[in-house]
Each structure stands twice: as structure tokens, then as C-alpha cells.
Amino acid sequence: MKVKVLHLFDAWLPHTMNWAYRILDATPEVQVQVAAPWMMDNGYLREDYHFYIPKWQQWMGKLPKNEWQMLAFRRILLKFEQIYPIYIRQLEKQIQTQKPDLLHAHFGPVGCRYLPLAQKTGIPLVVSFYGYDYEKAPLLKPALRARYGELFEQAAAITAAGPKGKAVLMAQGCPESKIFISPMSMRPEEFPQHKRFKEPGQLNLVQVATITGKKGFMDTLQAFQMALSRCPNITLTLAGERHDTALVAEMRQFIRQHQLESKVQWLDFLPHTQLADFLHNFEVFIQPSHYTADRDCEGGPVSILEAQSGGMPVICTRHFDMPTEVLHEKTGLLAEERDIAGLAACIERFYWMDNAVYQEFSQNAGAHVRNNFDIRQTGIRLKNLYNNILKIEF
């Protein structure tokens, strides 16, 4: 018999969170239910999943097609829901007809909001941490620190993407015995190994990510500009949703100031279905992520796994759990956070690298992802966690 798991989100589902859909899809022998006070009809409303669509959206008769439609209203609604949890009260009544065996909240603050529901119904709660919720959320909202303490005490299990995430949660008081490592993962066959030929003295770099501070876009541009004088046959392509408008303006100014227009191509949001083919045009993926002033961070970016799966080495930083995804001197090169000179040196090294050495990096990258980040294995481990909580025999 399948385990019934109710997955809890703020919104189902922004395109940039397609990885969450893939986690649910890869977990075997689970009857998936999804609850969120904001639902979107953007390709993730599977017929075999049960969705608790908010009543007000049912009254409207249609759902927004993406995260950009009705954005201002969505933000107001979610803030209102945090103060007056009307949707959660409705959900408590609705789940009585298909009562789940487990609740699985995605992101720490979501877990805090649904903890009273778990306590009232007696349904075990699993909470997954991914990024901003590790340190940024409790820094900006100090009241969350106490709520995290209660969450760590009452939840059946807490998941983190890697050892750094585990250490951060333990430092905040989460018992080690409750923490389960569930790495960010992907399907390697969706990004099959692609043969590239690398000549010394040429390099095409690419960075694909939502344009926010923690992704390190300005560090990429500065390192690229620093390396350019020694690496004239180099190009950089940037792609991603332009979320942080102030950062976008700063990037534009930097490109103009240093006359990089002929060397830097800047694209908009790229659908995930096009990403694998798009990456064939480049030799190295770069993402120098770092902490922001408000302690926003990456858990473990899926994009650098996808790039490596396709045989592309990665330049990144020793930020959070990224060193478990990219192995220094084996599948890519790592620099310290905000080390522009170090990043430039990594770029220059790949620029002058010959094909034989490049192929070693390429083969290692693909094998590393296939062996350690196949989402089907992650799904099996997650299902085993559910079984352990419910004391189900394997």
C-alpha cells in the first residue's frame, strides 16, 4: 500500500523550483498530495496527484499560468496567510476525507506554519531545508529562532542538502539524530554526456541562474573582466530570470563601463526543457555563489549538477554544500567566496587547458553526478525515511 504524503509549500510551483516537482516524482510508492495557499497551472498539476486548491482560487475558476501573473496579489495573500492562516484551517477540515500518513513541509518557515496542524492531527511532520531558510529567514525574522527550536523538537525528521546544511541546523539546536541528508539531485539521462573538444587558448563560459545576489553574478563579471587581458578569446553568456532589479542595473553598468558588450551575451529566462541543448554551446559552467549581507545562501544548486551530468566542468566557490557537488581538481575548480582573483585564475586555467586534460574533467564530472546525485536514489532514500518514521517493514 502506498504511503500518503501531503507536501506543503508556499506556492505550487514556480518554474525555478522545478527540482521540487522532480523530487516528488522520483519518490516511489507514495501517493502524493499537495497543499499551498497559492496554486499555479504551469505544467506541474499532475492528474495522479491530489491538490488542495484554495477555495478563493476555486471560486475564480482558473489558476495563474506562471509565477509572474498576479505577483503583487500573491505576495499580499501570502503575508496575510502568515498572520491569519485561513487556508491552513480549511486544509485541516479537507484532509479528513483523505487523511495523509505524513506531512512534508518544504522550507523551514513553511514547516513552522504547519507545525500546529501536525500537532493537532497527530500526523508526523518532515521538514526540508534548502537555502534562505537556513540562516536568512531567522536573521530577518528573529521570532523564527524560537519557532525553529520548537520545530526541531517536534518534527519527526529534518532534511538538509549536505553536511554544511546539517552543521548549520545542529548549531541552531537541531538534534543530529533527527537530521537526514537528502542531496539536491537530478535525472542524469535528461543531461546526457555531450562530447566537447577543447582547444588551448579559447573558452566559452556560461552561467544560468536566477539573478539574485547569492548567485555571484557580479563576481563572475569581475573575474571575467580580470581574466580577459590574458585570455582574449573568451566569451561569457548569462541567462536567468532578472529578479533583483538593482543587481541587474549594476551588472549593466559594469558591462558598459568595461566595454564588454562584444564579449558578454545576456539572455532572459531559459525554460528548463531547453537547458540541456543550450549548454552544448559552452565548455565551462560558472557559479561563484556566496553569502549575502542578510545571510542568504545556496543549499546545493541543481544547475551545476545538470552541467556536470552533460560533461561540463564547473567553476564555483567553496560555498555551503557546493564542494560536495563539484570536486576540486576533479570535476571542476573551486575558489573561496568573493575571491575575484581566484576565480579569474580558474578561468585562465581552463582557457589554456588542452583537450586531454579537459576530457578528464569532463568524464569525471558526468560520472560524479551519475554515481552520487541520481534523483531516483534520492527518492528511494526519502521513501525509506518515510517508512522508518511510520515503522513500515521494508
Each PLM stretch: what is its role?
Residues H328-E329, L333-I340, R349-N355:
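Conserved acidic donor-binding segment of nucleotide-sugar-dependent glycosyltransferases
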Residues L6, T159, E190, R196-K215, ...:
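Conserved donor-binding/catalytic core segment of Leloir-type glycosyltransferases
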Residues I304-S309, P313-C316, V326:
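Short hydrophobic beta-strand element within catalytic cores of glycosyltransferases
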Residues H280-R295, M312:
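Acidic donor-binding loop of glycosyltransferase active sites
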Residues Y130, R145-Q193:
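Donor nucleotide-sugar binding/catalytic pocket of nucleotide-sugar-dependent glycosyltransferases
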Residues V248-T273:
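Nucleotide-activated donor-binding/catalytic signature segment of Leloir-type glycosyltransferases, i.e.
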